[in-house]
Amino acid sequence: MTRPQPSGRPKTELPGRGLASVSQAGAYLVSQISNLDRVVALRYAISFGNQMDVTVSDYLAYLEGDPGTRVFAVYLEGFQRGDGERFLEAVRRIAGSGRPVLFYKAGRTREGSAAAASHTASAVGDYEVCE
């Protein structure tokens, strides 16, 4: 099976399948999609912004029920109040099912924390908590 490229040239079947990319920043997600489309076939690409209605944990809880999702990639600037524990529980369940969760936490430096606060109003908290 091949996928057409914008140039019209067919692309061979991609080896990686079943990736769910869940990102708090839309620009990060678009960059990821642009770079990964040569390597993996995304199953889901979700940008959730400031998490006013639906949190990162809600998305992971939903996606963990999809057996076609085999790898989870999460970019997070900060948790909503009380959501960190729910996130950890979801990650543990997913990892316990044999599926990896790749986690990139923004805000490791003072400058990164300031950028996250101005972008999605996230209080990034201590980076060490997420390690």
Where are these regions (language model features)?
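Catalytic-core regions of core metabolic enzymes
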Residues: 1-131
